[in-house]
Amino acid sequence: MAIIIGGVIGYERGHQNRPAGFRTHILVCLGAAIVSMIQDQLRVNILKYTILHPEVAQVLKTDLGRIGAQVVSGIGFLGAGTIMRDKGIIGGLTTAASIWATGCLGLSIGWGFYYLAIPAGIGIIIVLV
């Protein structure tokens, strides 16, 4: 699903000859989805471990938002690379925003929030077209 939604958004950007296109948006969406799935699996593993070893329950902690927050800020730096200034005109802001939004979509897909990701992806595409 991340490949499809990221690809549709990236196709629109590439079709408009923007600095980040088809492959970039797929990789951002897919990468964010993978990170969120890894984080969710780590949380499950920690919970299982604390059930088996209750003596470590006060030491081990899990924070569902921590890794996702790092993805969101990291993608912001990637998007910043698409922003250019030429003769006083700033361009690439929409592409930067689409990269950031695509990363957020990837996180929601990886965590299984399809009911949020699908309408949000459609909304992003409508805004870009």
Task: Provide a role label for each language-model segment.
Residues 15-28, 63-72, 86-101:
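Short, non-helical or kinked segments that cap or interrupt transmembrane helices
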Residues 123-129:
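Alpha-helical transmembrane segments and their membrane-interface exit regions
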Residues 6-18, 77-90:
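C-terminal ends of transmembrane helices
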Residues 47, 65-82:
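Hydrophobic, membrane-facing alpha-helical anchors
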Residues 112-122:
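Loop-to-transmembrane alpha-helix initiation sites
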Residues 1-59, 63-65:
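Alpha-helical transmembrane segments and their membrane-interface boundaries
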Residues 52-62, 76-87:
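Short juxtamembrane and helix-loop transition motifs at transmembrane-helix boundaries
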Residues 27-37, 97-110:
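Small-residue-rich segments of transmembrane alpha-helices in multi-pass membrane proteins
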